Structure formats: C-alpha cells, structure tokens
Amino acid sequence: MFKTTREKGASFEQQARLFLEQQGLRFIAANQHFKCGELDLIMADGDTYVFVEVRQRKTILFGSAVESVDWRKQQKWLDAANMWLAQRNLSLEDADCRFDLIAFGRTASDIEWLPNFLD
C-alpha cells in the first residue's frame, strides 16, 4: 500500500500518464510547480499542449473527483499553465492548448478522461 498521500498521488499520476500515452498523447513533463499552482502532467496531442489535472477520490462523501475541481483550482490551473508557457515565450492567447481532467474513483482502473474540461 501507499505510505503517504504524495506516493498515492504519484501512482495515480503515473497511471494517468500511461493511459494518455495509450490514447496517442506524448509525455512532456510532470509535477511542474509554480507559486500560483502546479501542473500534474503536460502532454502533447499533435501540436496541442495538454495540461492535465489528475484527481482521485476514494469516496464521494465530499464530492466526486470531478466536483473537486472548483473555480479556485481552475484559476490556479490556468495560471500555472500560463507560467509554463511564458517560460517558452508563449501564452494562453497564442499557444494551441487545452485542459484535460483525469478523474479516478477508488482504483486506477476506475478512470474517466474529460478532454477540454475548461472549455
């Protein structure tokens, strides 16, 4: 079993990465940290940057994994993506990008992929 929440999160992020690679996306980076927030996974779908948030909930007592992505989390996600793009002299306005959510239930096999979650 997992010793820490961080180890559990890393395991689900790895499962999400493998799932997305099986769907044809290419891995770019993981766990990119900025003052404004973190990017769990950055993938590429052709020429499109895909910023992936990975969420997991073992119970829906406090809401599902999808419901846990509130307005504040969405803003942090956008801000972190803009920071990552800025490091490459790009921005959300001029880069081809999208924001996908990978939501897990209790297990890694209980996976839901929501492309264009912030559309």
From Swiss-Prot:
One of its GO terms (molecular function) is nucleic acid binding. HAMAP family: UPF0102 (MF_00048). It comes from the Bacteria. Belongs to the UPF0102 family. InterPro entries: Restrct_endonuc-II-like, tRNA_endonuc-like_dom_sf, UPF0102_YraN-like. It holds the Pfam family UPF0102. This is UPF0102 protein Asuc_1462.
